[in-house]
Amino acid sequence: MKPSEIREMSIEEIDEKIRQLRLELAKERGMLTMGTSTENPMVIRNLRRDIARLLTIKKEKLREKR
């Protein structure tokens, strides 16, 4: 997910996307602990990075509102 795409979203949409990605991350981590290999081992890293991007841009937007 590109930062330019995230900046176009509203804060509510960002919150919803964060929730979705956190659920997906929990599912992937659960599969990993169960011993099931994932199709793509980079999925967990990419999910974590996307969540960090979303949180960073959300904070930027909240600072702008002040």
Swiss-Prot record:
Family: Belongs to the universal ribosomal protein uL29 family.
Assigned keywords, A-Z: Ribonucleoprotein, Ribosomal protein
GO cellular component: ribonucleoprotein complex; ribosome
Record InterPro entries: Ribosomal_uL29, Ribosomal_uL29_CS, Ribosomal_uL29_sf
Organism: Thermococcus gammatolerans (strain DSM 15229 / JCM 11827 / EJ3)
Molecular function per GO: structural constituent of ribosome
GO biological process, one term: translation
Protein name stated in the entry: Large ribosomal subunit protein uL29
Keyword Transmembrane: no
Gene3D superfamilies for the chain: 1.10.287.310
